[in-house]
Amino acid sequence: MSLVPKNFSRDFLSQSALTLRSCSDSESADRLRTFCTAISVAPKFYLDHEISIGETLDTEFRTKTNALFNKDAINLPFRTFVIEPTLVGKKGVRPSIFEYFGYDDQSIVISVAIKNLITNQWDIVLSGACVTKDGYQVERSDVSKLKQKFPDGYLLSVVRVACSLLYDITAMLECSNVKVETLPSRPLNKSAAKRGALPFDTYHILTIEPRANSSSTKA
């Protein structure tokens, strides 16, 4: 089956446009615009066919992740970082965190935390996945705690959002104009946890640099 180009950044750019129109923080808006500009011109990943997450989450999710990468073309230059896009949906703004833990030279473990709009706390939606040079393979997808707390319809919608953005961001990891930068650690205390604070002690951000033939400034 021949490969066809897939624009992974389209939905993210559309959601970001809504965020920018309502954003009162000029510095945050500028950072988001810079990121959107970078991903709009970044190299796009390739899929051999379209796949979508269906009602049978485990089967469809595994099918999609296994088919996500062309194993001969995969190139993941970074080992650990966190990115914070903002989603605008029917219930308002939903911040999401994507954390990539690298543990050797050939693979990256991925964990996604998404903010629960009902409890205002952070839930680990996909507790583990592994990207290797041989392709993409799910090691563990633990949503049992969410299933105990929320109806199936709500759970499925949250997982769909997390999976969709996970694919978008992972697909952009091979872009040569994206670099990783570590932020100072921040201790997490009980009062911060009650406010829905981020569940990580150390944060990482993406620093986007212009292409060699671009006149843009560094973010």
Regions inferred by a protein language model and the residue ranges of each:
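C-terminal, beta-strand-rich globular interaction domains
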Residues: 214-219
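Intrinsically disordered, low-complexity regulatory segments
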Residues: 1-211
